[in-house]
Amino acid sequence: MLAIIGGSSLTKLPELEITERKIVRTPYGLTSSPILFGRLGRLDIVFLARHGFSHTIAPHEINYRANIWALHSLGVENIIAISSVVGINPDFENGSLVLPDDLIDYTYGRKDTFFEGQECPVIHTDFFNPYCDELRQELLNITKAHNVPIYDSAVYGCLQGPRRPTRAEIARYRRDGVDVLGMTGIPEAVLARELKIAYAHFCSVSSIDCFDSGVETEGCNEQTFMAMTKIRQLLNGL
C-alpha cells in the first residue's frame, strides 16, 4: 500500500476519493491527523496530514513516531512525503520541483528512533542512502511522462524550526553543500527506514529571496501554489 504524507502546502488532497477515515492509536500516541483511505487515480492509498488538517502542529512538535508506526500497522510499504522547501542553491528556481537524494540533519531533541534499548533492542540502521532509489525512479518516470521538469539530485537540510534561519546559518548550510531547506524530513525518513518502508521526498521549491524580508510575497505564494498543483496532478497519475 502507498501512503502520501502531506506537508504545510498539502494538508488536504482534493483529488482523493475518500472511502474511510480512521483514528489510529499507537504505542506512541495519536497521529497528526485521522488517516484517510481512498482512491487516487488508479491506486488505493492512504493520506496523512503531517501538520494536521488545519496546520496546527509545528515541525518540532509533530509525533513522527506515531505517524510512521500507524502507517506501518496499516500495511503501508511505500511513502511519498510532500513538502514545501526553501531553495538556497541559486540554480533552484522559485516554483520548481525537486526530488532530494541525500540529506543533512540539523535538528535536535526529536524522538528519532523506535529502537531505544527498552522494549526494542538498539539497532544501528543503515542510512547511507536515505531515500529509496526505486521509489524515486518511479516518481522521476512519472514527471518525465508528463514533461514536467524536476531536479533529480539535491541535498535536503532539515532544520529544527519553527523559526527561519539567519543569514549566517544560511551561509553555513551552503558551505555544507545543502541545496534546499525544510523542517520535517527528519526523523520521518529515518523512522520509515527502521520499519523497512520505502520513502521518497517530493518537494516544491520557494526561493530564499521570498524570505529575505521575513514576509512571504504574493508572487512567492502563487509559485508555491502552482508547484503544489503540479505535484497533485502527478500524484493523480500514479
Q: Where does each model-flagged region fall?
A:
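Alpha-helix C-terminal capping segments
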Residues: H72-G75, D91, D176, V190-A198
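Generic hydrophobic/aromatic pocket-lining and core-packing "Φ" positions
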Residues: I68, I170, I186-A189
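Short, flexible loop segments at the rims of nucleotide/cofactor-binding pockets, characterized by
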Residues: H55-H60, C158-Q160, G177-V178
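His/Asp/Glu-rich mid-to-C-terminal helical/loop segments that flank catalytic regions of hydrolases
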Residues: C210-L238
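Active-site rim beta-loop-alpha module in soluble metabolic enzymes
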Residues: F128-R174
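Zn-dependent metallopeptidase/amidohydrolase metal-coordination segment
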Residues: M183-G219
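Metabolite-binding pocket within alpha/beta catalytic cores that recognizes anionic/polar moieties
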Residues: M1-F127
